Amino acid sequence: MRPWPPSPWKDISAYKNLRKELAAGRVYGHLSENLSDFLAQSLLPTTDLVMDRQEKKKQVRFFTNPELCDITEDLVLTEPYLAQPMNPRNKNIVTPGNEDFVREHLYEDEALHAEVAALRNGFMNNAQALIHGDLHSGSIFANEQGIKVIDPEFAFYGPMGYDIGNVIGNLFFAWANKAYTGGSAETQTALEQTIRETCDKTAEKLAAEYDKLVTFPLYCASAFRKAYLDGVMADSYGYAGTEIIRRVVGDSKVIEVTSVTDPAQRLPMERALIDLGIYLIKNRAGGLNGAAVTEEFRKILAEGRGTHGQNG
């Protein structure tokens, strides 16, 4: 088994914060390659499919992280979907002008609540792999040579899709910001391509790692292999959706959103992101891929709508 932490967890002095780089319009050409390499190579080797099962159980105990998991379970997978009195702590921060939109599309959508409940349950009960647990673009440093990852304090054994989804979701913030603040078409195209390639290359590399590392005969059955990998990517798109939504309406927002101070830009941008998040959550099991999710966001942008008429 490969050592943990994986190789990108090293000195970052020659690297720059990915969130800030994307905000400045610098999209590295090999970013999707680097992100997908890290995800595939750090996640699958820590599963029961590859690890010795006794060692895996020891690792699960060692990396039990209840206090920080509580934060995710509350702030990411509960509170963005509930209003008072069901949400007594009420940490959501909804931009004035979007209150009715949030109430209708997040607080009152029972079908969405059922899907988020499934994702929350998976986060709490699927000790699938050792995950970073907070893998947003502020925890990634990059340059033309590669990436480095920091801040693993949320690490625990959870669903692989949570890390993958956090990466995908945070890339969309950069695209949304550029789309609503007059960013160049070239930058927007580069961001779209990076998202599409990150989605698809991650799926491809997970499959390649699976074929290389998994040797247990039952796990090598083609139907199981397909179901397992499809499940990981379905989780990934779902958690991308919950990450997007929580960064818009929750109390831990991202600079790509908060830096937009003109309500004429901020309000529709937030609605578009919420709209995308709902789409990803509700359609996660429908065989999504990079082309499908970027095409969906292009539709949202092209129509200039504050509400996506058919969320699901």
Where are these regions (language model features)?
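Activation segment
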Residues: I147, A155-Y157, V254
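Conserved short submotifs of the Hanks-type protein kinase catalytic core
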Residues: R2-A14
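ATP-dependent phospho-/nucleotidyl transfer catalytic cores
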Residues: K16-H132, N143, T261
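Pre-DFG segment of protein kinase catalytic domains
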Residues: L130, K148-D151
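Conserved catalytic-loop position in the HRD/HxD motif
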Residues: D134, S139, D151
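ATP/Mg2+ or Mg2+-diphosphate-binding catalytic cores
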Residues: S222-G312
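Long, amphipathic alpha-helical stalk/connector segments used for oligomerization, subunit docking
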Residues: L218-C220
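Active-site activation/catalytic loop segments of kinase-like enzymes and analogous catalytic loops
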Residues: G161-T215, A240-V257
